[in-house]
Amino acid sequence: VNVSLILKMLGIDNTALGVKAGFTGNYVEDYLKEKEITTDFIEVAGTTRINVFTKVIQDQKEYKLVNKGPKLSEEHVQRFLKKISELRKGDYLCVSGSLPQGVSPSILIEISRICFEKQVFLILDSSYEEILDCLSYQPFLLKPNEEELQEWFHTEVQTKDDYIFYGQELLKRGAKNILLSLGSEGALFMNNEKVLSGNSPTGMVVNTACSGDAMLGTFLAGWHQGLSLEKNLKRSIAAGSSTAFRKGLTDFSDVQELEQQIKIQEEE
């Protein structure tokens, strides 16, 4: 949903796919329609989850209370996969976040297979280790963070060289592009042609929730708009930082100013 909102803010029409449940699901759908975003949700029993993020200013700690949400049946899963199979060659599909109850992470592999066969550009932003099993289907873009790299490769990842090494390992396994979000350290973009790094601008962090979504949505919009990789990475880092410096998603009012603090450089 956050990626859909960011894309729309930047002038990219898109359709929000997924499931909805109860009054919270209806609220989300109504909000998206209010923003003139097309929706294509499967309705299920229960209630769409509400997650709570709390920042304790005194000790600069953030607490995330993530609810389970509704449980999906096998019928719901198959209906969702059917929607994916109806995508057309050249479409872009962004799969982001955690899966509902009743859905095995192996669904990511099936989605990857369908997109590969349909020649759909697949973007994966999820922490499950099954992401590694999706790489043979050559997803267009992965957006991991440093914690996910550590979990996937069962190792400590601490330096920029480490990030680049494991990012390139993902490329070797089949991913086409990597957008690696590094929080206060900025971000890296990698493909088989180049490696770019960018620092984070300074500011008071209010809430890190959704900053990765803002970065990803901005990057996808920039890709569609034909921005250079350097300009796109800079704007994407600024949008993610702008979101971290406020209570909700960025409105892009301060993004241009934040961009002035960001330097993009090509890594060897």
Positions of predicted regions on the chain:
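Gly/Ala-rich phosphate-binding loop of Rossmann-like dinucleotide-binding domains
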Residues: 8, 116, 224
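Cofactor-binding loop segments of dinucleotide-utilizing enzymes, especially the Rossmann-like FAD-
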Residues: 19-22, 44, 57, 98, ...
